[in-house]
Amino acid sequence: MNIRLMAAALLASVAAPAFSANAADLEVTHWWTSGGEAAAVAELAKAFDATGNHWVDGAIAGSGGTARPIMISRITGGDPMGATQFNHGRQAEELVQAGLMRDLTDVATKEHWKDIIRPSSLLDSCTINGKIYCAPVNIHSWQWLWLSNAAFKKAGVEVPKNWDEFVAAAPALEKAGIVPLAIGGQPWQATGAFDVLMVAIAGKDTFQKVFGDRDAKVAAGPEIAKVFKAADDARKMSKGSNVQDWNQATNMVITGKAGGQIMGDWAQGEFALAGQKAGTDYTCLPGLGVNEIISTGGDAFYFPLLKDEAKSKAQDALAKTLLDPKTQVAFNLKKGSLPVRGDVDLTAANDCMKKGLEILKKGNVIKGTDQLLSADTQKQKEDLFSEFFANPSMTPEAAQKRFAEIIAAAD
């Protein structure tokens, strides 16, 4: 997509003033549509409405892979929303370079974002050529294995404490009519599971060499071969999932139809909505119980450039609201994510969130792949792992060869 060629059309379209019955209405687009996510979004909307403005919800059903092209098309096509969700990283890079997004540096400076946002890499991901273009709202980590205590009780085995024990328990789960590992059909779920396995099995340094340094030799080497072996185990264990959306896979764990799920901490919102309690109804293993490391992925809001002064002021108000301490707590407790502020009260956090906070405090973190790789490279990864998990005839060796080629060509 050549965004720069479309920029002139958008700038012309926003040159004329917009007319609205209520100039403080602000459309906010996002892809948070599951039950737990919707409850979290409601907290953001409530906080923003309290400023005297009005949150106009622009939820787009489906994953980020479905929503982002729609969001980008609107911005480049001259129909920008007031604010839009993207993940931490490079997803809005071309939009910023094309001059289509607002510079939030003044707001960030007045609100002291550099002093309150932790880790600092989150704000770094919002910064291009020294200017800040987004407001981070949470830290979401992929590195979690969620386990159904009821499923393992039914299968007559102890709840696993790590990935190897989980793999060993798979036959007992299958014998009890339980799918060992729930993975939905959306491509991002398969590639996310692989990335989690890499951190757990190959370690933090190897993860950085492959995705940060884009070292194709390491990607083709023996350490990553072990990861592909584990991915092959995961593929076999997930046979029979037969669901598409991530929250449907989470529901299989909640209802005891599946033993576990590799999924980010946003899954906590679904467990909470179902009235389940961490440690009693389900178990969470950060780093798959092998390497207690979490990624600092998550979400941020970007603000398209508008010429309507009232809406621009509403954008300022929203940016400030997103980082307000009370908003941070209310939103993240329901979202299952960690706040980006290091100075908020999280005494109400559940056991799993407390584990994440402790890991974050220790500094056992890595950047998310969205922060390290371009959207195009991420899409190539998704295509590969979607095929790998769906096609049992693709060998781990063949998949690793293709993976190394993707890393070699990564930008």
Which residues does each PLM region occupy?
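Extracytoplasmic/periplasmic solute-binding protein
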Residues: 128-137, 143, 167-213
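Glycine-centered hinge/linker elements that transmit conformational signals in sensory
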Residues: 170, 212-242
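Mature extracytoplasmic/periplasmic domains
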Residues: 106-109, 266-270, 299-376
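Conserved N-terminal structural module of periplasmic/extracytoplasmic solute-binding proteins
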Residues: 21-98, 110-113, 159, 276, ...
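Extracytoplasmic/periplasmic substrate-recognition and gating elements
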Residues: 24, 46, 51, 155, ...
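Short, solvent-exposed loop/beta-turn-alpha elements that line the ligand-binding surface or hinge
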Residues: 105-118, 201-226, 273-277, 286-293
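Conserved C-terminal helix/tail region of periplasmic/extracytoplasmic solute-binding proteins
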Residues: 153, 359-411
